[in-house]
Amino acid sequence: MLNKRGVPCRCESDGPPRQNNALSGTTFYVVGCNKAGWNKCRYINAISTCCKEG
């Protein structure tokens, strides 16, 4: 089962893509944002979700 996380991703609150934009989210694969204190901040695709702590 895939449960990898740790790849940075862009949340909706990060604004439009620009060079040197901070990526405040973390990609969760398969399991979604299932950790306490993590919230979905952007849909990526069927097997990964961008989540933000807090």
Curated annotation (Swiss-Prot):
Annotated positions of the Glutamic acid 1-amide modification: E53
InterPro entries to which the protein is assigned, alphabetical: Myo_ane_neurotoxin_sf (IPR023355)
Subcellular location: Secreted; Nematocyst
Presence of keyword Transcription regulation: no
Family under the similarity heading: Belongs to the sea anemone sodium channel inhibitory toxin family. Type I subfamily.
Function: In vivo, induces marked paralysis on shrimps (C.multidentata) at 10-20 seconds after injection and a weak toxicity when injected into insect larvae (M.domestica).
Protein name, as recorded: Toxin AnmTx Cj 1c-1
